[in-house]
Curated annotation (Swiss-Prot):
Homology family: Belongs to the KRTAP type 20 family.
Alphabetical UniProt keywords: Keratin, Repeat
Highest taxon above the source species: Eukaryota
Organism of this sequence: Homo sapiens (Human)
Subunit structure, interactors included: Interacts with hair keratins.
Species classification: Eukaryota, Metazoa, Chordata, Craniata, Vertebrata
Protein name: Keratin-associated protein 20-1
GO CC terms: cytosol; intermediate filament
Length: 56
């Protein structure tokens, strides 16, 4: 299961966007899972222009 938000800070699953530098609502690529606060259900990674979400 992988979800994408758009480049310019789109609110996809997790509410993050790479347009805001891997940490618009979260705290960098190491944090900011579902809802943007790293609750452990999703692990975000930044691939180029898109956030990619996948389960741990």
């Amino acid at each position: 299961m992988i979800y994408y938000s758009n480049y310019y800070g789109g609110y996809g699953y997790g509410g993050l966007g790479c347009g805001y530098g891997c940490g618009y609502r979260g705290y960098g690529c190491g944090y900011g899972g579902y809802g943007g606060y790293g609750n452990g259900y999703y692990c975000p990674s930044c691939y180029g222009r898109y956030w990619s979400y996948g389960f741990y």
